[in-house]
Amino acid sequence: MNRDMPSGRELKSFLEQTFSTLDAVLSGQNARLQEKEVGTVSFVGQGIVRASGLPHVRSEELVVFPGNLLGLVFNVDLDEIGIITLDHTEDISAGSAVRRTGRVLDVPVGEALLGRVLDPMGRPLDNRGEVAAARRLPLEREAPAVMDRAPVSVPLQTGIKVIDSLIAIGRGQRELILGDRQTGKTAIILDTIINQHDKNVICIYCAIGKQSADTARVVSVLESFRTLPYCIIVVAAGEDPPGLQYIAPYAATSMGEYFMKRGKDVLVIYDDLTRHARAYRELSLLLRRPPGREAYPGDIFYIHARMLERATHLREELGGGSLTAIPIIETEAQDISAYIPTNLISITDGQIYLSSRLFQKGILPAIDVGKSVSRVGGKTQLPAYRTVAGDLRLSYSQFEELETFSRFGTRLDEETRRKLERGRRVREILKQKQYNPLCVADQIAALLSVTSGALDGISLENIGAAEKRIQEAVHVQLSDLCDRIKKGEPLTVHDRKTLLDAARSAVAAEPERHRNADS
């Protein structure tokens, strides 16, 4: 027998020691088996993917492709699922793996987003690094219950005379802006955002399907007016996948809801929902959903209604915050009776219609007062507006009809001519340059002057200069009254007389100044 061979006792001791060491090592490991459900891509199209092998996947669940590319489950059939991609699909092909995540899509929210330009997933587009958001909220959330809502009671001042006086918007309201291309829809939005600089309103601008150059111009304007500190800009460009365009307005709404739940006032602008509807139509047709009117799927009304219903004013017990929604719609050939415009008109609390006819005449902003309405905001107007412009909407509409009638060459009596001249001056006063939102006192002074006849003796081409002189005089001479108007105090009879006296003095002083200059 070989003496070098270990004895049975030694071998047993060695094995016991080895297994003991192995047990000690294994006991220190917390290895857990992780179940991953992985399927296979069967088809890749323009912004959509079909896959199989995911029997337990849920609708609207987030899935991951190779390279951490993301998708959202849209269709769930017996043998395959339809996925909308949130990234470009160049790196996805038939046979690629697709993995479940077990969670729904969410977006970053919080103060860290202010001043940033992001895509709908919360990824930065401004080259300023990742967003350090402390929380994330789901893309889709239930709208507040009826008993959680409070009446809309506080005005949202746009700084635009014709809107604040005739088509007022309240905080928590949904007001649609619609009109043809190049009629000034985005210009109204920019002025509204600029006017919130001292109003404690957080503004979220959501660009959907717009050209990158157009969005860059919007960002540049907001930067130049130093509005970005209270703004969030969410961008899904026209060259982005349609899936990213589809989720963009929902992402912007979730970002706004975070602040609303904390008692803050939020303004969310969707620019525009026409492109959003087209992106949804494209995805639905590619995924073979049954088309309806104008090839839109049957739930096109629902996808906008469920989003805009999240805009509201909460009860004080829930913080008293508000989310005001201003969707934009692009019409074709001034047709506001098309499918998507009529859907949005029926969902929202009013609409502001921009007329290409007025735009071509140089009447800016080109708001058609007769076709515009605010079903909620009128109750929120500051008392001073109701005092000076209570019947202005009716009288202005009558003036427009009278002006149309007078073009037929009918002989007019003195009273009719006087109404026409007054109406033309009202129209001149309601004109306003872009990027020049006015404070409440400036608007009240101008409106009171024109409705009381203080500008009847001024030629139309000099109305703008006279308005500026009146506003300067009111700020210099009546600063206390301006502060009271801003606070929402009503105008007394004495206040009206004081304002009118200052306006008439400012108007009368101009010819004297010219005479002094000429001499």
UniProtKB/Swiss-Prot annotation:
The keyword Cell inner membrane applies. NCBIfam families: alt_F1F0_F1_al, atpA, PRK13343.1. Pfam families: ATP-synt_ab, ATP-synt_ab_C, ATP-synt_ab_N. The record marks 372 as: Required for activity. Belongs to the ATPase alpha/beta chains family. Its EC number is 7.1.2.2. HAMAP family: ATP_synth_alpha_bact (MF_01346). It is a peripheral membrane protein. It comes from Syntrophus aciditrophicus (strain SB). F-type ATPases have 2 components, CF(1) - the catalytic core - and CF(0) - the membrane proton channel. CF(1) has five subunits: alpha(3), beta(3), gamma(1), delta(1), epsilon(1). CF(0) has three main subunits: a(1), b(2) and c(9-12). The alpha and beta chains form an alternating ring which encloses part of the gamma chain. CF(1) is attached to CF(0) by a central stalk formed by the gamma and epsilon chains, while a peripheral stalk is formed by the delta and b chains. One of its GO terms (molecular function) is ATP binding. Keywords: ATP synthesis, ATP-binding, Cell inner membrane, Cell membrane, CF(1), Hydrogen ion transport, Ion transport, Membrane, Nucleotide-binding, Translocase, Transport. GO terms for cellular component: plasma membrane; proton-transporting ATP synthase complex. This is ATP synthase subunit alpha 2. It catalyses: ATP + H2O + 4 H(+)(in) = ADP + phosphate + 5 H(+)(out). ATP binds at residues 179-186. It is found in: Cell inner membrane. Produces ATP from ADP in the presence of a proton gradient across the membrane. The alpha chain is a regulatory subunit.
